[in-house]
Amino acid sequence: MQMPKKFIITIVLLFAFSNNALAQFGFSHEVGVIVGPVAFQSDYGERYNFATNAGNTGYGIGLIHYLNFSYRADCNCYTPETYFNDHFKLRSELSYNKTDLQHFGRWVDPDRTSLFANQLRGMRGSTSVTNIGMQLEYFPLSIRDFSSTIGAWAPFISLGGQFSFYDPEAYSTLGPLNTPVSTPIKYYNATTNQGGTVWSIVGSVGTRYKLTELSDLMVDLRMQYYFSNWVDGLNPDPAVYVENRANDWNVWLNFGYIYYLQ
């Protein structure tokens, strides 16, 4: 499911309005971009298998915004010093990731020549996911001290939620799915090319580096757990195939640039 353009415009307008409203309280703002590789953990491949983890990877890009509670935009001065103001930021995000998927692991090793192995090798998939959400970031070290020290580091952890639009595709190089030629019994009627929406939990750990007075570099490693097993377009019956009972999730290594708005 592609996110409707009208919906994107509405979100952007609401986002701008909320930022303007929050600015009345003196919060300052930061904006940035992120990009990096995504490893998608799905029903394609073998669990806990390095080839699967390395093979089912894609890319992600995003726009991010922060509310900085330690600094006031209306007076270019620090806010009253409280623990929350000096150790927390609120991050908003609009991001997109895409991953091509296929089966890896022992069941598709070259020495396996059965029909089942050939069918697995022929299965292909992909998923594109657009995310909108927020995370609360906690900095154990002082945000004020970091902001005033070029070359400083600011490690953080975060937790939040996102609403996602996913658009999967599943097919086989052997022909149409759900036929004895192309599809293992396990995956009969277990695929879809129909998109949908899903909520997810996002957690990350990372650090910032103070590049200049008004800019930071950032790296973070995050995990996103979806409350659905259809994000990849593949979902064999979990009551029968317990190895596929887990919902879809991904790991994203972000590299970012952040600019402080005055």
Where are the model-predicted features located?
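Predominantly the C-terminal beta-signal and adjacent terminal strand-loop region
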Residues: G26, S42-E46, A51, V198, ...
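Residues on the lipid-exposed face of transmembrane beta-strands in outer-membrane beta-barrel proteins
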Residues: V33-P37, I61-L67, A73, M134-Y138, ...
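Short glycine/proline- and aromatic-enriched beta-strand/turn motifs that initiate or cap beta-hairpins
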Residues: A23-D74, I258-Q262
